[in-house]
């Protein structure tokens, strides 16, 4: 029997990670302008996401420009977009599958083993979703580091990690942890031994033997 509390905890953590992946994908602060160096501009903040780039003025006014051309984007941004969207879609599938396998739900009550396997499959899908998010954020973050330390990159064109990137890392961690907890509900095989057959007891003879 699977631990219902462990299942519920894993489902909640993985679901929170899935929500975090959506928030991270939508936020425009994947990388923010770096103020390191001599060229320091404090009147505005420049940041860029997967779908747009924005400039925030000190007065509170924000101007954003959506990336219109798909072919004009670099390969890292395109791959990050694809992985994040795939991770979100997989997380949605995992939520439906895991819900069926939860012990607190009444689906598949007649088949306890199949119900537990549904929870395990949902946990595995959550693991794949978390890996997709982790690879996407790590790849994008590595690109930021490479460009920051590249001597050919101008000082006024260097960026640092943004809030959305940290949100994505936290979301991936929650999805992975929740997926592991759900996968721990895998039904264990029990060794069955053959039941010994009872031998009939000899019945005592009712009469006496005569020679």
Curated annotation (Swiss-Prot):
Disulfide bonds join 54-64. Its main location: other. It is a multi-pass membrane protein. GO terms for biological process: bicellular tight junction assembly; calcium-independent cell-cell adhesion via plasma membrane cell-adhesion molecules; cell junction maintenance; cell-cell junction organization; cellular response to butyrate; cellular response to lead ion; cellular response to transforming growth factor beta stimulus; cellular response to tumor necrosis factor. Residues 29-81, 137-163 are extracellular. It is found in: Cell junction, Tight junction; Cell membrane; Basolateral cell membrane. Residues 190-211 are annotated as: Disordered. Residues 210-211 are annotated as: Interactions with TJP1, TJP2, TJP3 and PATJ. InterPro entries: Claudin, Claudin1, Claudin_CS, PMP22/EMP/MP20/Claudin. Pfam families: PMP22_Claudin. One of its GO terms (cellular component) is apical plasma membrane. Disruption phenotype: Complete perinatal lethality. Mice are born at the expected Mendelian rate, but die within one day after birth, due to severe defects in the skin barrier function, leading to rapid transepidermal water loss and dehydration. Detected in epidermis and liver (at protein level). Widely expressed, with highest levels in liver and kidney. Residues 1-7, 103-115, 185-211 are cytoplasmic. The chain crosses the membrane at residues 8-28, 82-102, 116-136, 164-184. One of its GO terms (molecular function) is identical protein binding. Keywords: Cell junction, Cell membrane, Disulfide bond, Membrane, Tight junction, Transmembrane, Transmembrane helix. Belongs to the claudin family. Claudins function as major constituents of the tight junction complexes that regulate the permeability of epithelia. While some claudin family members play essential roles in the formation of impermeable barriers, others mediate the permeability to ions and small molecules. Often, several claudin family members are coexpressed and interact with each other, and this determines the overall permeability. CLDN1 is required to prevent the paracellular diffusion of small molecules through tight junctions in the epidermis and is required for the normal barrier function of the skin. Can form homo- and heteropolymers with other CLDN. Homopolymers interact with CLDN3, but not CLDN2, homopolymers. Directly interacts with TJP1/ZO-1, TJP2/ZO-2 and TJP3/ZO-3. Interacts with MPDZ and PATJ. Interacts with OCLN, CD81, CLDN4, CLDN6 and CLDN9. This is Claudin-1. It comes from Mus musculus. The lineage of its organism: Eukaryota, Metazoa, Chordata, Craniata, Vertebrata.
């Amino acid at each position: 029997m699977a631990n219902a509390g462990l299942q519920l905890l894993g489902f909640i953590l993985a679901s929170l990670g899935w929500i975090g992946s959506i928030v991270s994908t939508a936020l425009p602060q994947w990388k923010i302008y770096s103020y390191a160096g001599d060229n320091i501009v404090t009147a505005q903040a420049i940041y860029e996401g997967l779908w747009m780039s924005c400039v925030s003025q000190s007065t509170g006014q924000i101007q954003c420009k959506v990336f219109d051309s798909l072919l004009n984007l670099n390969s890292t941004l395109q791959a990050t977009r694809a992985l994040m969207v795939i991770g979100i879609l997989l997380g949605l599938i995992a939520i439906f599958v895991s819900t069926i396998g939860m012990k607190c739900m009444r689906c598949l009550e007649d088949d306890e083993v199949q119900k537990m396997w549904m929870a395990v499959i949902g946990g595995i899908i959550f693991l794949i979703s978390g890996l997709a998010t982790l690879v996407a954020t790590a790849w994008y973050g590595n690109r930021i580091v490479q460009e920051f330390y590249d001597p050919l990159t101008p000082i006024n064109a260097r960026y640092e990690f943004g809030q959305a990137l940290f949100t994505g890392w936290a979301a991936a961690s929650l999805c992975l942890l929740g997926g592991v907890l759900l996968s721990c509900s895998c039904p264990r095989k029990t060794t069955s031994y053959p039941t010994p057959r009872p031998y009939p007891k000899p019945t005592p003879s009712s009469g006496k033997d005569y020679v």
